[in-house]
Curated annotation (Swiss-Prot):
Organism listed in the record: Parabacteroides distasonis (strain ATCC 8503 / DSM 20701 / CIP 104284 / JCM 5825 / NCTC 11152)
Pathway: Quinol/quinone metabolism; 1,4-dihydroxy-2-naphthoate biosynthesis; 1,4-dihydroxy-2-naphthoate from chorismate: step 2/7; Quinol/quinone metabolism; menaquinone biosynthesis
Protein family per UniProt: Belongs to the TPP enzyme family. MenD subfamily.
Pfam families associated with the record: TPP_enzyme_N
Gene3D superfamilies associated with the record: 3.40.50.970, TPP-binding domain
Protein name, entry field: 2-succinyl-5-enolpyruvyl-6-hydroxy-3-cyclohexene-1-carboxylate synthase
Summary of subunit composition and partner proteins: Homodimer.
Gene label: menD
Gene Ontology MF terms in the entry: 2-succinyl-5-enolpyruvyl-6-hydroxy-3-cyclohexene-1-carboxylic-acid synthase activity; magnesium ion binding; manganese ion binding; thiamine pyrophosphate binding
Catalytic activity: isochorismate + 2-oxoglutarate + H(+) = 5-enolpyruvoyl-6-hydroxy-2-succinyl-cyclohex-3-ene-1-carboxylate + CO2
Gene Ontology BP terms: menaquinone biosynthetic process
Amino acid sequence: MYSDKKNILQLVALLIEHGVSNIVLCPGSRNSPIVHTLANHSFFNCHSVTDERSAGFFAVGLALHGGKPAAVCCTSGTALLNIHPAVAEAFYQKVPLVVISADRPAAWIGQMDGQTLPQPGVFGSLVKKSVQLPEIHTDQDEWYCNRLINEALLELNHHGKGPVHINVPISEPLFQFTTPELPKVRVITRYQGLNVYDRKYDDLIERLNKYSKRMMIAGQMSLIYLFEKKICKLLYKHFTWLSEHIGNRIVPGLPIKNFDAILYATPEEEKEKLVPELVITYGGHIVSKRLKEFLRKHPPKEHWHVSLDGEVADLFGSLTTVIEMDAFEFLEKIAYMLENRQIEYPKAWEYKSRNLPEPEFAYSEMAAIGGLIRSLPAESALHLGNSSTVRYAQLYTVPETVEVCCNRGTSGIEGSLSTAIGYASASQKLNFIVIGDLSFFYDMNALWNGNLHNNLRILLLNNGGGEIFQALPGFKMNERTHRYVTASHQTSAEGWATERGFSYSAVHNAEELAAAMSAFTQTEQPSEHPLFMEVFTDKAEDVRLLKEYYHQLKNSSQAQNI
């Protein structure tokens, strides 16, 4: 029987899956649940060494002899510090050493309890990875614990070998050994490159062809990649391709971009048909919260993430494989390995996408965004502010030749204007910036810089505060809360924009919007000055129109059985 501590069970099961069989065990009470579970499983070759300093070096020797990772397990407190010299040796000799330390719960560190010191990160830069496991009480705790252990064990051989540290907090009671078997655990594997002549990749390609419901999701990328026509033909029909405007042109064909609206409009009982078996992601961040929730609620059997850095990014909680290589090289290689058979899954998504019309909003900030996107000149650049702006833009079709930029690395509202102006200063294209009022006024001294050129055109959406917070489902605000959450204001940018040399126009209704948009997007006569259009709308009306649109979308879709 094994320990009842779920973080220990995850750890031991994953040590087995990652092939760490040589374990050096040091005496102690806090680590006894780990020791008991390891010592009573036939997979492990256990060695008893009392002195932790010697135990660490003993484990280094085991790893050096076979070339495979070895582990050392110790109790809490200064016992862990005694392994430090061995960790340093393993780091500089590039030995795959796993240091497993038991610990007291974080609440008791620094409270004069026995054998306690701050153990997480104690080895500093001398380990390739250091993780602090959670004690598991919820499904999310279990997912997080599993991911951390996988991350640590994957680093043993990532870009060279070296030591890792796994700190395991264990609450009392310590000695409940009531678990008859180890759990089945999610194992994350990493492939570095994709050599088609290497037999270890046969399994990967076999798994790829096993699934008929395959989804490819392209995240943010600030580039255009032109696939050969042959590659497009081989790849496109085998997957449902999802991308957002910030993905630009990185898909071999036309991706589905209105998937957020599709997921909203599709009744819950019909969503099962849309659930993929395999998801492959590449590129950076994804804006759609609805897509993330959908794939977390309905996890695919496998999720592969392709990236040059090979980092673990478990966005949907179902990551199984990291493929460390250029995404486009990966796509071009698998194109020739896909079995040529009829795949119906993409058609379900494509049908729903085709039958969802673009919205037609009355005068509002959504109408202003749509009006600009429909009028964008070819070969221009579109910079989207964060929060509501980037989300509302996704409701419309952006011309393929338009570059789309947005600060989605951390998705904050600060710096969007400065980033866009910096980009425009180095660009020969017309650069259109769409930004909300809070984001603009937060970063308004971006206009103070002396790098404002006539290729710059700013569309400021001013509805007197952060209306997106007003639209959050389930969040009902009283007047006092509303003031602070939405940061209501009565500020105009006119004085500052004209002071900084912009040709300024104010818009208050649909007629003014149409007239101003024509001048704002025209390319026949180059403007002598950068342009600034401030569109004033009503917060409450913006929210009402948005909710009305989604309500109609759901009703219309159900009526048409989309």
